[in-house]
Amino acid sequence: MTSKSKILFIGGTGYIGKYIVEASARSGHPTLVLVRNSTLTSPSRSSTIENFKNLGVQFLLGDLDDHTSLVNSIKQADVVISTVGHSLLGHQYKIISAIKEAGNVKRFFPSEFGNDVDRVFTVEPAKSAYATKAKIRRTIEAEGIPYTYVSCNFFAGYFLPTLAQPGATSAPRDKVIVLGDGNPKAVFNKEEDIGTYTINAVDDPRTLNKILYIRPPMNTYSFNDLVSLWENKIGKTLERIYVPEEQLLKQIIESSPPLNVMLSLCHCVFVKGGHTSFEIEPSFGVEASELYPDVKYTTVDEILNQYV
């Protein structure tokens, strides 16, 4: 049996990063996380750091702005997974440069973990973030770096507790806002499952230089069907308030961050069908639940039970 790749994470203590780091360590990959000293000692990160230590994760001190430490860290790994946050997406050119200099990386997973940025229609402010991710893709390809792009669509833990209701703190009990006509299908995946599928792809030749779409059939719902599922669970019919696209676009322009970001993402997915408006072609992509049928992913139906 071949040994498992050694994986270096950059941005591993962030929202989605910590789930993927955990999946890596639990599956037996030697797991390294690049951290700043300030992160190691940050009270807000202490439980994540402690959890990583218990899982045998190794910490490497370094920084995206310290090229030498970046190159030295990358030289210790076979695979690099970036899960840097929104504000650091553009800094990934530094990772690409360091990967080129190190010369040993078998695969790079840039910070994607959302929509497929090459196959979406978006408006600002989401448009700029998607454009940055697309430029990162083109640079990776131009430099000849082996890659996998993970398109995991929506994080279930972020959108389902409120049924994707902008500004809400809990799931609706009386009225529900439906953006557009509620018919385009969206995909919601549990963060732990995103971690599992991502790590399964690391040493899989079928995902090399491909987009890994996490689009399990049981987690793919139109918004209307999602509301109906929720209504069945709470035993109540909600008043559905449909917001036309023109009204939503006006609201995006008039809103401040982070609401405008959330609304522009929702416009892309719930109005324009950004998750499912295209077929996954073998020339560019593969689907995770088809590649890894043994993974028992958590369904949307199961996830919603905890919010009843």
Curated annotation (Swiss-Prot):
<feature type="binding site">
    <location>
        <begin position="11"/>
        <end position="17"/>
    </location>
    <ligand>
        <name>NADP(+)</name>
    </ligand>
</feature>
<keyword id="KW-0560">Oxidoreductase</keyword>
<dbReference type="InterPro" id="IPR050608">
    <property type="entry name" value="NmrA-type/Isoflavone_red_sf"/>
</dbReference>
<dbReference type="GO" id="GO:0050664">
    <property type="term" value="F:oxidoreductase activity, acting on NAD(P)H, oxygen as acceptor"/>
</dbReference>
<feature type="binding site">
    <location>
        <position position="45"/>
    </location>
    <ligand>
        <name>NADP(+)</name>
    </ligand>
</feature>
<feature type="active site" description="Proton acceptor">
    <location>
        <position position="133"/>
    </location>
</feature>
<feature type="binding site">
    <location>
        <position position="137"/>
    </location>
    <ligand>
        <name>NADP(+)</name>
    </ligand>
</feature>
<keyword id="KW-0521">NADP</keyword>
<dbReference type="InterPro" id="IPR036291">
    <property type="entry name" value="NAD(P)-bd_dom_sf"/>
</dbReference>
<dbReference type="GO" id="GO:0009807">
    <property type="term" value="P:lignan biosynthetic process"/>
</dbReference>
<feature type="binding site">
    <location>
        <position position="36"/>
    </location>
    <ligand>
        <name>NADP(+)</name>
    </ligand>
</feature>
<comment type="function">
    <text>Oxidoreductase involved in lignan biosynthesis. Catalyzes the NADPH-dependent reduction of phenylcoumaran benzylic ethers. Converts dehydrodiconiferyl alcohol (DDC) to isodihydrodehydrodiconiferyl alcohol (IDDDC), and dihydrodehydrodiconiferyl alcohol (DDDC) to tetrahydrodehydrodiconiferyl alcohol (TDDC). Plays an important role in the biosynthesis of secondary metabolites. In addition to the 8-5'-linked neolignan DDC, can reduce the 8-8'-linked lignans, pinoresinol, and lariciresinol, but with lower activities.</text>
</comment>
<comment type="similarity">
    <text>Belongs to the NmrA-type oxidoreductase family. Isoflavone reductase subfamily.</text>
</comment>
<protein>
    <recommendedName>
        <fullName>Phenylcoumaran benzylic ether reductase 1</fullName>
        <ecNumber>1.23.1.-</ecNumber>
    </recommendedName>
</protein>
<dbReference type="Pfam" id="PF05368">
    <property type="entry name" value="NmrA"/>
</dbReference>
<dbReference type="InterPro" id="IPR045312">
    <property type="entry name" value="PCBER-like"/>
</dbReference>
<dbReference type="InterPro" id="IPR008030">
    <property type="entry name" value="NmrA-like"/>
</dbReference>
